[in-house]
Amino acid sequence: MNNLHRELAPISSAAWSQIEDEVARTFKRLVAGRRVVDVTGPGGADLAGVGTGHEIGIEAPLEGIRARQREVKPLVELRVPFALSRDAIDDVERGAEDSDWQPAKDAALRLAFAEDRAIFDGYGAAQITGIREGASNPLLLLPAETAGYPAVIAKALEELRLQGVDGPYTVLLGSDAYTAVSEANDQGYPVLEHIRRFVSGEIIWAPAIAGGCILSTRGGDFALHLGQDVSIGYLSHDDQSVHLYLQESFTFLMLTSEACVVVRPE
């Protein structure tokens, strides 16, 4: 037994398999940060912190002694509760392939958005500085007309090169910006294809954020440290519902502030 207490849930192995598949598929489709940062772990539920390699001066215990404390970033644990119908769960044993797992998918969306927003925009309460929050390059504005997006992205790439940041370079765009650029044409030529001509990496849909960013995926600039990866745990049940939760623990290190250019709508 572990602290997820899954063996106490009135859920068959077949139903667990369907629930896990829906959660994994939904989380993977929605999360963007893991596609562009270095991911270390999972190190396990007992991983409590990650050393930054830095020291902080503290008061010495005796005269003539220098005291330094190692800086450690504690992991944050996120939990999203949800409930599933007993009927939906039991129907799997009767051969159902269409049980309603929407509450599990909704929980996966919330967890994916929470992780991505911590990675890109920071999470002060968890001592996390996000990529866009910590970026040192000038902010660029996306014009109202999507035909102007390629010029802005080209300028962002130029800024990265001027800062000595090598590629490959990847573009992340929030839902509104990604949809707009996907549907747009410039004199009959798709704007998205125009951007792809000079971006060496991917153009990624990042629904958790507004605006977007252009960054290097060369490695060594951004680090996500996982303790417990996304897991499903059991809380309680009654004659109608089974109460479960999604849980993960992580911290994020912003290592190179010049490796990202933030873009926002005008």
Annotated model-derived regions:
Residues 132-194:
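Extended, solvent-exposed, turn-rich assembly/linker loops in the middle of proteins
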Residues 125-128, 176-180, 211:
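Short, catalytically relevant binding-site loops at active-site mouths
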Residues 1-68, 227-228, 233-241:
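N-terminal "assembly arms/tails" that initiate or stabilize quaternary assembly
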Residues 90-155:
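Alpha-helical scaffold segments that mediate packing/assembly in large oligomeric complexes
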Residues 40, 184-266:
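Sequence/fold signature of self-assembling virion shell proteins
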Residues 34, 38, 115-122, 161-164, ...:
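Long, hydrophobic, amphipathic alpha-helical segments used as structural scaffolds
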Residues 52-98:
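Long, hydrophobic/aromatic-enriched structural stretches that serve as scaffold segments
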Residues 71-73, 158-161, 232-234:
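A generic local secondary-structure boundary/capping motif
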